[in-house]
Amino acid sequence: MSTAVITTPGLIQFLNTMRNHMKLCGYSSGTVKAYLGQVQSFISFNRPTNLRNITGQAIQSYLNQLVDSGLSRSTIDQATKAMEILYYELFGKQLNLSGFKRPRKKRPAPIVLTSNEVCQIACHAKTSRNRLMIELAYSAGLRVSELVEVKVGHLDLDRLMLHVPGFDKNKRTTFFSKHLKESLIKQAGAKNTSQYLFPSERGGTLTTRAVAKFFKKALIASGLKKLATPHSLRQSFVNLMLNQDVDPVALQNTLDLRALNSLPSPNSKKAA
């Protein structure tokens, strides 16, 4: 490793050029700042006498050093992207990192709510529609994206079942609590089968952001200290089923879980 480094004026000029090119490519000012910071950290580590002396091997060694130092996956991803931009800026071609192994992403511990806690949150929802959405998401183990897409025709009220549309193997049928039947009948009202069960004010699809917003308000009003999100309802339903000794494979198929290891551990009570 060389003890001499490129001159400051030369480095500043290069970083300014790189900054301008990233802005032209549509990167936000925050992203540009972060990537330039990663480039400067690499140069301080590598100390090249000339930027064009930088090699793909040197970059890979630097990234491996970052991995070994225990940095998070997101930081490694940011550094990798910055190095790819740096290399392309210098040589006009893609950086080959085929031998570089990034650390695995750490899955956050699922936030599990008890049935009483779900009820507590639902009871503090501002409207009966919002309350029913919280209850149905929990009772049927729905993703938020699935919840907002439910149409009246997806309900089988006699059999207490809900058809969840999807592509090919992602199509499935789940179930819901009999205690929701009357509320669902009322919510469906005079809507035809092709209409959304929980439409927006304009009659279209309610956004997942809107669900997150009213869920957060209900959570705060409930007084619970868990950092739950709408997705916690699905995770909590899975935990409830496992505690009732439901076959994990059957549960995986019913809820379209990507892998059995995505299930929270039975009796999990962790809060973030």
Where are each of the predicted segments found?
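Conserved catalytic core of the tyrosine transesterase superfamily
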Residues: 1-272
